[in-house]
Amino acid sequence: MAAHAAHAASLLKSLAHPARLRVLCRLVEGEAPVPELQAVTGLSASALSQHLAVLRNLDVVATRRQAQTLHYRLLEGPALGVLQALHAAYCAPQR
C-alpha cells in the first residue's frame, strides 16, 4: 500500500503543473498534433517539448508521427480516470 501511495503522490505531483494540465485537458478530448497543443498552451516549442517529455516518461501520453508532425494521445492507465474527472470538473464547457 505504501508503494502505491508513493507512486500516486509522484504522479499527482508531476501532473500538478498548469501547463501540463492544459495539455492533458485538451488530450482528454482526443489526439492532438503538437502545433495545436502549442496554440492551446501558449508555450514555446521548447517548453512544450519539456512538459511532453515528463508526461511520456510517466507513461501518461504516447506519440504517433504523421509525416513531420507528432500527434499526442492519452494512454490507458491509472492517470486516465483522474484526468477525466479533472476535465469534467474544470475543462468541460459550463452548462
Which ranges hold each PLM region?
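Alpha-helical residues within the helix-turn-helix
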Residues: 39, 50, 56-57
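N-terminal helix-turn-helix DNA-binding core of bacterial DNA-binding proteins
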Residues: 2, 6-46, 66-78
